[in-house]
């Protein structure tokens, strides 16, 4: 691969955690449709928590887990049935689409979607709508720049968590009392 190659990441969740009971994501046919669409625009890579379907083995990401965020940061898009990686892509300014039964129910992803337009969630029965939305972004030559603007807007609204924790630890135990005060100003950590 060269630095100029366009690539897309698919992330498939195992849905084996206790909170995943009766939850699910994309089926095999939907995954096939997704790959067929994305391959028209560049390379497709798959990362998965579960055993990869044999027909998708050739798409497996050939990287170590600790390299994932760097790989994600330079991708064109993430399509997933995983909440965590969808949010991570959003924070990196990478267009992300997720399709699972959690869509519309998780506050952080809802904020990233409704307030900032960084990620989009669809139920499995809305898969065709998701494909249409993905295609619109794929055809938008300014998508990367637009997502960078959205990302910067989101980051401007948030505090610097590292600065907060450094202050909190350096000033412990008084910092606990300050944070619990009704008039505590988190804005000073922007």
Residue ranges, per PLM feature:
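Short internal beta-strands
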Residues: 45-48
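Nucleotide-activated sugar donor-binding and catalytic core shared by glycosyltransferases
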Residues: 1-41, 51-190
């Amino acid at each position: 691969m060269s630095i100029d190659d366009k690539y897309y990441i698919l992330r498939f969740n195992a849905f084996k955690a206790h909170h995943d009971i009766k939850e699910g994501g994309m089926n095999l046919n939907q995954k096939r449709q997704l790959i067929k669409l994305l391959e028209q625009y560049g390379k497709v890579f798959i990362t998965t928590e579960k055993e990869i379907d044999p027909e998708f083995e050739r798409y497996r990401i050939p990287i170590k887990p600790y390299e994932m965020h760097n790989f994600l940061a330079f991708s064109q898009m993430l399509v997933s049935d995983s909440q965590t990686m969808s949010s991570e892509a959003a924070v990196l300014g990478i267009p992300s689409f997720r399709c699972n039964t959690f869509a519309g129910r998780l506050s952080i992803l809802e904020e990233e979607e409704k307030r900032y337009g960084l990620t989009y969630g669809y139920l499995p029965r809305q898969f065709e709508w998701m494909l249409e939305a993905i295609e619109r972004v794929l055809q938008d030559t300014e998508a990367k720049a637009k997502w960078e603007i959205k990302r910067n807007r989101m980051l401007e609204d948030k505090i610097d968590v590292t600065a907060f924790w450094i202050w909190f630890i350096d000033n412990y135990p008084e910092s606990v009392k300050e944070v619990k005060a009704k008039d505590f100003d988190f804005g000073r950590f922007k």
